């Protein structure tokens, strides 16, 4: 008798198109937003990334995606020092040029990530989260949510399971079925989250959750952070 596959388990099967789809969805919403902003808005501080402005975050994201497209992964790539160098290399660029590079990267990186066997999937999720950081800095609604949220949550669930992260069962306002995150071997009883998807994303990425209504039982917020 075969084992039953639950909706929560389906997320374990990698969809190679998912990271690129997430980038494309976010591109279609974020790029017009950026092109409509005043130049001075690019200097706004980004609370989730101390010391970085909106422009810094965008330059980091566009550089990372360009590296993916051009297959440039030297030793130390994506370290804080490497990220700072990538941003500094774009200091002489106009804001429009940074946005153009970001648009190209969000378009062209998807097929490369799809063919990488999963090792770059986390980068796509990180890009989507940084787009939320920018929306948050602008005071725009929908940060860490929107049309890309279902793909982002599925990616987050699979990445946390692959990493053997602390187990959590999430009952989300945004999904019909509970989402299972973290290791599933049964060594640890799972924690429980009740709330919305954007708040769950904030918890897993170390973003502030001030004012959000949610329940978290059996695990501490600091233990969920995949970037911590």
Indicate where each model-derived feature is located.
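Structured surface interface patches that mediate subunit assembly and partner/cofactor docking
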Residues: 2-19, 44, 73-80, 114-228
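Active-site-adjacent scaffolding segments
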Residues: 2-118, 122-129
């Amino acid at each position: 008798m075969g084992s039953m596959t639950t909706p929560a388990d389906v997320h374990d099967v990698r969809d190679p198109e998912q990271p690129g789809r997430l980038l494309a969805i976010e591109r279609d919403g974020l790029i017009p937003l950026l092109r409509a902003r005043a130049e001075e808005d690019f200097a706004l501080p980004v609370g989730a990334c101390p010391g970085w402005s909106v422009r810094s975050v965008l330059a980091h994201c566009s550089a990372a995606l360009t590296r993916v497209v051009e297959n440039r992964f030297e030793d130390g790539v994506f370290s804080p020092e490497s990220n700072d160098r990538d941003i500094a290399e774009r200091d002489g660029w106009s804001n429009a040029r940074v946005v153009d590079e970001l648009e190209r990267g969000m378009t062209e990186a998807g097929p490369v990530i799809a063919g990488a066997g999963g090792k770059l999937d986390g980068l796509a999720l990180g890009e989507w989260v940084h787009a939320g950081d920018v929306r948050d800095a602008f005071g725009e609604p929908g940060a860490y949510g929107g049309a890309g949220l279902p793909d982002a949550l599925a990616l987050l669930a699979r990445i946390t399971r692959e990493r053997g992260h602390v187990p959590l069962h999430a009952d989300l306002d945004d999904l019909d079925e509970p989402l299972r995150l973290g290791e599933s071997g049964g060594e640890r009883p799972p924690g429980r989250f009740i709330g919305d998807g954007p708040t769950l994303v904030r918890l897993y990425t170390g973003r502030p959750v001030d004012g959000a209504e949610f329940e978290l039982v059996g695990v501490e917020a600091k233990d969920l952070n995949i970037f911590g």
